[in-house]
């Protein structure tokens, strides 16, 4: 999975992602955070899954490429459904997913 944002400030992108989550139930389970040069998406409910995206700055903004994922056993059957919801949040925040 790859994500492209027109912004060049990763912290501003995290803020947009959090704002896009709003009051959804998903906001209680999903956390976006920057650690060094990585965007870390943490999903916590009946276990913890983490997705690590390496951040590269390009002339078009920030590009995030999935570099590592750890999916909790309880999350595996729901991976597709949760991924779709996270993609919608990313798109609502102004990002493009490929």
What are these regions (language model features)?
Residues 1-40:
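Negatively charged, low-complexity tracts enriched in Asp/Glu with abundant Ser/Thr
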Residues 51-76:
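Intrinsically disordered, low-complexity regulatory segments enriched in Ser/Thr/Pro
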Residues 30, 59-66, 89-98:
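Short flexible/disordered coil segments
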Residues 22-25, 51, 59-62, 82-86:
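Short, low-complexity, polar/charged sequence segments that are solvent-exposed and flexible
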